[in-house]
Each structure stands twice: as C-alpha cells, then as structure tokens.
C-alpha cells in the first residue's frame, strides 16, 4: 500500500491530498516521522561543535518536517471530521507524542546547548526576533522539566503522558455525548422559532434519518436559536440541560473521574517544576504572571459586573411577569426574554436581522476587510482536495503573488468539535 505521506504531494500548491489519505496511513507515517525526528535531535544534541544560534536553535527549527506534516493533517481531521478509526489513533498517539516531546525536552546534552546560548545571549549579536526565539525555546524546555533532577524527572514524564491521555479522553467524551443526543420535534414544538432555524432543524432530522420533521442536537448552532426564540419553555429547559451536561451524564462518557485525576496530576506536575500550584505554573509565562494578579483583575471587575448582571436579571424578570409568566427566571429563559426585551426597547428583532448576515455575504465582507487592511485577494479553487464536501478553498494572493490557501469549513456536524477555531497545515 502506497502512503501519501511518503510521496510528493502533487495537488495544486502541494496541498494535502485528502482524497488519498486514509486512517491506515497514519500509523506507519507517525512511526517513520518520529524516528526521523529523533535522529535529527540526536545529531544536534551531539554536535561536537560549540553551540551557536545557527547550529542549535535554527537547526531545531528545521527538524521534524515529516512529523509536522503528519501531525497537522491528523489533528485537523481529528477535530474537523473524526470517526472511530481517527479517535482510536488519537487516543493511542496522545501518550506516544507526549513521551516523544518529553524525551526531547529532558535531553540533557540538548538543553545544555540551549542553556549555554541563553546564559550568553548578550554576546551573540542576535536581533530582537532571534533573542525572542531563543528565550522561548529555553523557557519551553525549562517548563517541560529540563531542570528537574532524579526520580522527579521520571515521575514528571509519566504525569505528562497520563495528562495527554486524559485530555484526549475528555474531548472525545464531550463529542460522544454531542453525537449521541438528538431531540426529534414536531412543528408545534418550534413555535416562535424563525425560518432559518427551522430549516436547520429539518436538515438535522434528515441527516439523522428520523421520521420526525425536525430535530435539534447539542451543537451550539442548534441550541442557541432554540434558547433565543422557542416559545416552548419545556423545550428550552430540556435542551439547555442536555447542552450543559455533555461529558457529565451517567454513561461511559462521564468526565467526572477524569477531571479529578487531571486536577491531582496538574498539581503534582506544578510542584515538581517548583511552583506552588498549577495556577502559578500556568500563568508564569502569561501576561498576568501570577494567580494573585489574575484574581485582582477579577475582583476589580466582579462588583460592577455582578451589579450589571443583576440589573439585567431584574429587567428580564419584569418581562416574564409582564407577559403572564408565573415563574422565576432560569438560565434557559435568559436568551429568550433578552430577545423580547431587545425588541421592546429598541424594536430590534434578531430573526429579522439574520438575513443580512447570510454566509456568502459574511465571507465576502471578511475577504473585503482583509483586502483593505492587508492587500489580500481571494480566488476560490475547486481543484484542491478537501476532507469534507462542506469545505471550500480559496487561493490567497497579494499583488498577484501567491500567499497561501484558506480552507473554510463553516457548518456544524456530528464528526466535528464545536466552537469557532482554526488550524494550519
């Protein structure tokens, strides 16, 4: 069996050949890529020449080309169009990749070269960008355990591997609950729901091969229109609770035990690295620098934010009472009555605004903004392989010169994790 990862990519612009890549290709591709990467790392770590920015940092930047290619394609598929084969590979590879990178970060000779450069950075004559790269490499190695000694190093490596597995299981559990949940609905259930949301619900029922004319899932794009527009309060409550319970249901996908173990291991990892808590470790290289600084910001914001939230709650409760409701405002009521209040105060109905935000118009607006700000032009390409029929590809250019490809994947589906996010190849 030929493996696309071992052959030149002949699609336009050497784009990933998604039409040829199969799940069975990843295991041998990972195996070869990891071996090649370790050989490259070994050569740098054991270079007899004194460490320089070029033979250490620049050399590291140039390693792992095949691994980067395999990883970028795989993780895009795992997030965008997964299946049981991809999930099995993801779960298997999570600790393997954690062990691989931990081994690199704890490579004594390699870190000694990086540390030597860091200690002498003022004598290297580097520009600001190169100094930043050196600093980031050094910090990443230290935060990954390069300075941990003795038994602590072995324990830290084990923790990192285990956390990788737990994190993967956590995400897969949430997606599994999202894939499993579907709520069939009749026309009467959708009173108040605008046509655009009804059309999406009808498409969901068709995709799930249901007898019911409509259906909703716990994907955000399915939930939010129901919470904002459905007159049926019982439906809003049922869907809201299902949405917020993903990964917390009494089934095989419950994340409670995973969370407890993750919290314990994160705390232990932080202490092995010399930090008081995981929060101190996590924030040390962020703008806040410490949990104390982050907490101060939250406390400064808390009082006015809470005051405003209570004002909004009281205003919404008045709408509930004024429209004949004899109940206390709950979480599944908030969007619905906020929509009514918006219409009452500003004569603004979101369902009437939605047609002005059609996908094609939003794509056109985004591309126009990119052109005005950065001089970028976008031309759709139909000859570039994609991983799902929903995906569209545009060639990006500036003043006639090729810049890259932009893949747009705009629709929710059961094989795709929720949210707004991006990846790169």
PLM segments and residue spans:
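Active-site-proximal, well-structured secondary-structure segments within enzyme catalytic domains
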Residues: 129, 133, 162-165, 172, ...
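N-terminal helix-rich structural modules
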Residues: 1-200, 215
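Hydrophobic residues within well-ordered, non-membrane alpha-helices that form the packing/core
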Residues: 30, 34, 41, 101, ...
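Short His/Asp/Glu-rich catalytic/ion-coordination signatures at enzyme active sites or charged loops
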Residues: 10-25, 74-93, 115-158, 215-257, ...
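Intrinsically disordered, low-complexity regions enriched in Ser/Pro/Gly/Gln/His and often acidic
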Residues: 2, 94, 236, 325-327, ...
């Amino acid at each position: 069996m030929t493996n696309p990862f071992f052959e030149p990519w002949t699609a336009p612009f050497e784009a990933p050949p998604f039409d040829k890549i199969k799940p069975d290709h990843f295991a041998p591709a990972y195996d070869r890529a990891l071996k090649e990467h370790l050989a490259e790392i070994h050569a740098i770590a054991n270079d007899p020449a004194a460490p320089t920015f070029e033979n250490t940092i620049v050399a590291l930047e140039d390693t792992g080309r095949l691994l980067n290619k395999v990883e970028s394609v795989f993780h895009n598929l795992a997030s965008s169009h997964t299946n049981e084969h991809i999930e099995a590979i993801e779960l298997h590879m999570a600790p393997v990749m954690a062990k691989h990178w931990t081994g690199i970060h704890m490579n004594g000779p390699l870190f000694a070269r990086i540390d030597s450069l860091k200690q002498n950075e003022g004598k290297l004559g580097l520009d600001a960008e190169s100094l930043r790269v050196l600093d980031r490499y050094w910090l990443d190695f230290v935060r990954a355990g390069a300075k941990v000694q003795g038994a602590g190093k072995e324990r830290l490596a084990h923790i990192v591997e285990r956390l990788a597995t737990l994190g993967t299981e956590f995400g897969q559990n949430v997606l599994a609950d999202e894939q499993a949940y579907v709520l069939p609905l009749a026309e009467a259930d959708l009173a108040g729901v605008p046509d655009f949301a009804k059309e999406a619900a009808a498409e969901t029922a068709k995709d799930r091969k249901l007898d019911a004319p409509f259906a909703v899932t716990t994907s955000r794009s399915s939930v939010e229109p129901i919470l904002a527009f459905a007159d049926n309060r019982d439906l809003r409550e049922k869907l809201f609770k299902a949405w917020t319970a993903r990964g917390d249901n009494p089934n095989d996908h419950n994340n409670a035990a995973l969370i407890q173990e993750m919290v314990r291991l994160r705390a232990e990892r932080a202490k092995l690295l010399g930090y008081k808590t995981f929060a101190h470790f996590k924030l040390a290289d962020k703008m806040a620098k410490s949990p104390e600084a982050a907490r101060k910001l939250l406390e400064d914001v808390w009082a006015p934010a809470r005051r405003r939230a209570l004002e909004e709650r009281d205003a919404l409760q008045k709408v509930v009472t004024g429209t004949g409701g004899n109940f206390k405002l709950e979480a599944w009521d908030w969007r619905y009555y906020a929509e009514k209040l918006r219409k009452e105060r500003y004569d603004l109905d979101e369902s009437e605004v939605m047609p002005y935000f059609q996908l094609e118009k939003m794509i056109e607006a985004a591309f126009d903004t990119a052109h005005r700000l950065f001089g970028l032009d976008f031309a759709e390409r139909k000859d570039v392989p994609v991983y799902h029929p929903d995906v569209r590809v545009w060639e990006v250019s500036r003043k006639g010169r090729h810049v890259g490809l932009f893949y747009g994947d705009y629709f929710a589906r059961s094989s795709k994790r929720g949210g707004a996010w991006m990846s790169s190849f």
